[in-house]
Amino acid sequence: FEEWDDRGRRYGILVAAAAWHWVDPSIGWRRAHDVLDPGGWMALLGHVVVRRPGEPEVYAQTADLHERYAPGNPDWGHPPLEADVRTTDSGWGLVEDPGDLFGPTVVRWYPTVQWLDGDGFADLLRSQSPYRRLDPGAREPLLDAIAERIRTRMGDRVARRYLGVLRVGQRTS
């Protein structure tokens, strides 16, 4: 985005879906402002894995396995509570604020849930960075143990909750 040749074109909307955090913050907001028409809109889409109080949560049921196969990993831990994530319902969330380049944001939340069996949950984890970074000699036994735990202690059905968020702001003059 930072080096993209816009050929002088201007746009009514610019959308970044789970990618804005990769854009150089010293360039990104100014560049977004400059490629938008006056009054154009900037939209950031993202999501967070969340949990709800009182609902069985996979990490709580498998913390001992995580520590057995990959002890001390700083990536392990409970997802945040959905209600806590919703407190970030103003501004641009966790990315750097654009200052006066954009007006006030409109924020909308979209909760979704994905139901998985033990094998499906292990396959999902295989695609995620904290697990991909593990040595396969630790990763595969850990994921096999997680799948087995889900099958035997959680009825072979777990929820993976996501809270999608849309943050939209209009370009200022």
Predicted regions and their residues:
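A short glycine-rich, Lys/Arg-flanked "PGG" loop and its adjoining helix->strand segment in the class I
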Residues: 26-40
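Tryptophan-centric aromatic hotspots in well-structured domains and transmembrane helices
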Residues: 4, 22-23, 46, 69, ...
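Portal/gating segments that form or line small-molecule/metal binding sites
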Residues: 1-2, 168
